[in-house]
Amino acid sequence: DNIVSSNALYGGTFTQFNDILPTLGIQVRFVDAEDPSNFAAAADENTRAFFCESCSNPALQICDLEVISKSAHDLGLPLIVDSTFSTPYLCRPFDHGADIVVSSLTKWVGGHGVCLGG
């Protein structure tokens, strides 16, 4: 199985996708999200999801969630969006076609790595 992901990711997410998921048999195909058509071009019959950050950390790349979600849905795939950096106040990915939205409470409770939240 594989997922197609933007290559503009928070470092911890990139490490998880690049180093940890392959040990579990999950391949991650990194694409340049500046061109949303790259997601569908990288997908195949073993692709299970598309992943991106609404606003990437630290590059500040903004993904076109509506176009990427349409590409995902045309292939019967979910779009997973990490919206930690933009916060739910500034961006609501569900309103733009995302199927799963994740956000790190740890970033907003303290921001210094002294607390932990999901």
What are the roles of these predicted feature ranges?
Residues 1-117:
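Conserved PLP-enzyme active-site core in the AAT-like
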